[in-house]
């Protein structure tokens, strides 16, 4: 009689589960059972899809020494995680951070939110209501910033990070403030970049930069999307420091990776419907620094000063000449500020 090679259903399930788990190094096991693979975007990072519950999966990339302090990076409106410049990531890793970045819901390779029957709403009217102190509460939106903050908190838990540092940019800075306020045990220290409390009567964007929020590309073709992206970055980016070749490359990558314009619309709706987050900013206990460019016309630097005044004991750093981006020229200084703040002994 020959020995049977058959295995039962339980053994098969266990075998498949083992095969689906991959760690770049043994130390990564502490982040949970996830299928990590080489990133398609950066030679410094690994990528995995992380299930955070409620039918939401987030596309996550991480890299650096897993024994170093984790730094979770939260990006802004309509921005896939590729908006974090690769050199910026490398500098943070070299400074001693274990870097984690991800696509927010509704963008990139993360789960998309589609709710049937939502009526069309005027974002311009919502902007005006927000600016003049009128509430957009109850507006028919798919989700709000609190929901996106919940995604971030669930990601921290899904990766078994315990407590982590947060770095939030623009809308991501608003999300980070809410996470730090609602989940103080999850956030050790925080750095915010060109962000806001989203409250009424703040200095508004300059007209040219405001137009970038409501202007749409001529079509959904790759050519028009790339052209629109170049115009956008030339409008909101740092004068004299916008690398057009790099902007084109990233725009093509974003388009080919996942083009989902509804996600940007719904994320902007989330910002407008959420209104002021000052009530959260006031509750932040994590030591915080706020970085803001003096040339930012999209979120004027006075809004960053308000963030720093609203968060208890926060420190404000004005970066002369920088706008609403992370130019190569300013990265060494920015990373020095961030790492000095986060990695205190």
Model-identified regions with their sequence ranges:
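Alpha/beta-hydrolase
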Residues: 205-279, 286, 306
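Conserved acidic catalytic loop of the alpha/beta-hydrolase fold
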Residues: 134-135, 139-142, 146-164
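Acidic catalytic loop of the alpha/beta-hydrolase fold
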Residues: 295-299
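N-terminal cap/lid segment of alpha/beta-hydrolase-fold proteins
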Residues: 30-57
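Short beta-strand/loop motif that positions the catalytic acidic residue
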Residues: 284, 290-292
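Catalytic active-site module of serine/aspartate enzymes centered on a nucleophile-bearing elbow/loop
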Residues: 314-345
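Conserved hydrolase catalytic core segment
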Residues: 162-201
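Conserved HGGG/HGGXW glycine-rich cap/lid loop of the alpha/beta-hydrolase fold
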Residues: 52-135
